[in-house]
C-alpha cells in the first residue's frame, strides 16, 4: 500500500545542502495582512517563504513585522531582491538580508523591464557571480533560457528559477519545452517561478519533472487564499507523483481499456 507521508519524507527537495519536505515555495506579498500571510503559508505546507527585503519589514521591531507571524523553526525565510534594477542594488539588498536573518540564502532578482518584469540576465549574472564568491547560496530568477541556466550553474548557484510566464500574470506555463531543456542542461534544482494562476498550472509544471515551484499572486490574490493554498499544496504533490509514476504515451487513436478477446457474440 502506498504511504504518502513516507514518500514525502523520503522525496525531499535539497537546495544548498538544506532539505525541504515540501516542493512548494510561497511568496509573502499581496496579502491583506500578515495574519492572512501566516494562515495561507501554513495551509500550503510550504517550508520556505520569500520576502522582498526592500518592501516588507523584517528588521524594525517597532513596526508590525512578518517574522512575528512566521514560525521560522518550521518555515525558512528566503529573502529576495525584488525591486532591484542593477547588480549593485541586488548585492546590497542581499547583504542587508543576510545581516538581518543570519543566513546567506537569497532569491536573486534583478528586473530589466517594468512592464513585463522580465529579469535582466546580464545584471543578474553579474550579481550572482559576486554573491557566490561572498558565500551566499544564490537562487536566481531567470528567463527560460537553457544556455543561461547552465551559466548560472557553472558559477556556483544553488538552483535556477526560470519563469513560467510574467510575474503575476497567471498565464500558466507558456514554454514547456524550454523548461525541459533547462532541466536537461543543469544538475542543480530547477524551481519554476512566476506566472502560475491556479492549481492545474502547478500540477502541469511539476509533471515536467522540475524540482519545485514558487508562487505568490496565485494564492494571495485568489478569492479565498487559504483554500487556494491547500489546492496548491495538493497540486504540487499530484504533479510530482504523476511525473514519477510516468504518464502514458499520447496516441492519435483510441485504445480499448478492455481486451476484445472473449467478447460475447464474437468468435
From Swiss-Prot:
Pathway: Cofactor biosynthesis; thiamine diphosphate biosynthesis. It catalyses: [ThiS sulfur-carrier protein]-C-terminal-Gly-aminoethanethioate + 2-iminoacetate + 1-deoxy-D-xylulose 5-phosphate = [ThiS sulfur-carrier protein]-C-terminal Gly-Gly + 2-[(2R,5Z)-2-carboxy-4-methylthiazol-5(2H)-ylidene]ethyl phosphate + 2 H2O + H(+). It is an enzyme of class 2 (transferase). Its EC number is 2.8.1.10. The active site is at residue 107. Its main location: cytoplasm. Transmembrane segments: none annotated. It is found in: Cytoplasm. It comes from the Bacteria. Keywords: Cytoplasm, Schiff base, Thiamine biosynthesis, Transferase. HAMAP family: ThiG. Homotetramer. Forms heterodimers with either ThiH or ThiS. Belongs to the ThiG family. This is Thiazole synthase. The gene is thiG.
Amino acid at each position: 500500500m502506498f504511504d504518502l507521508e513516507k514518500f514525502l519524507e523520503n522525496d525531499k527537495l535539497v537546495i544548498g545542502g538544506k532539505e525541504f519536505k515540501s516542493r512548494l515555495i510561497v511568496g509573502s506579498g499581496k496579502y491583506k495582512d500578515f495574519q492572512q500571510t501566516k494562515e495561507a503559508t501554513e495551509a500550503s505546507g510550504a517550508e520556505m517563504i520569500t520576502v522582498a527585503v526592500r518592501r516588507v519589514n523584517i528588521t524594525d521591531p517597532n513596526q508590525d513585522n512578518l517574522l512575528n507571524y512566521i514560525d521560522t523553526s518550521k518555515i525558512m525565510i528566503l529573502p529576495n531582491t525584488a525591486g532591484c534594477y542593477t547588480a549593485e542594488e541586488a548585492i546590497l539588498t542581499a547583504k542587508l538580508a543576510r545581516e538581518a536573518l543570519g543566513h546567506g540564502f537569497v532569491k536573486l532578482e534583478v528586473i530589466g523591464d517594468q512592464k513585463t518584469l522580465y529579469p535582466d540576465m546580464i545584471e543578474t549574472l553579474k550579481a550572482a557571480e559576486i554573491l557566490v564568491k561572498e558565500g551566499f547560496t544564490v537562487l536566481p530568477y531567470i528567463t527560460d533560457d537553457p544556455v543561461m541556466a547552465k551559466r548560472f550553474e557553472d558559477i556556483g548557484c544553488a538552483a535556477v528559477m526560470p519563469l513560467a510566464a510574467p510575474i503575476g500574470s497567471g498565464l500558466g506555463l507558456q514554454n514547456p519545452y524550454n523548461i525541459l531543456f533547462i532541466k536537461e542542461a543543469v544538475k542543480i534544482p530547477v524551481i519554476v517561478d512566476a506566472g502560475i494562476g491556479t492549481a492545474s498550472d502547478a500540477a502541469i509544471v511539476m509533471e515536467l519533472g522540475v524540482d519545485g515551484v514558487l508562487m505568490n499572486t496565485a494564492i494571495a490574490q485568489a478569492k479565498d487564499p487559504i483554500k487556494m493554498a491547500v489546492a496548491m499544496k495538493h497540486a504540487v504533490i499530484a504533479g510530482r507523483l504523476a511525473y514519477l509514476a510516468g504518464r502514458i504515451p499520447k496516441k492519435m487513436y483510441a485504445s480499448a481499456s478492455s481486451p476484445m478477446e472473449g467478447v460475447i457474440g464474437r468468435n
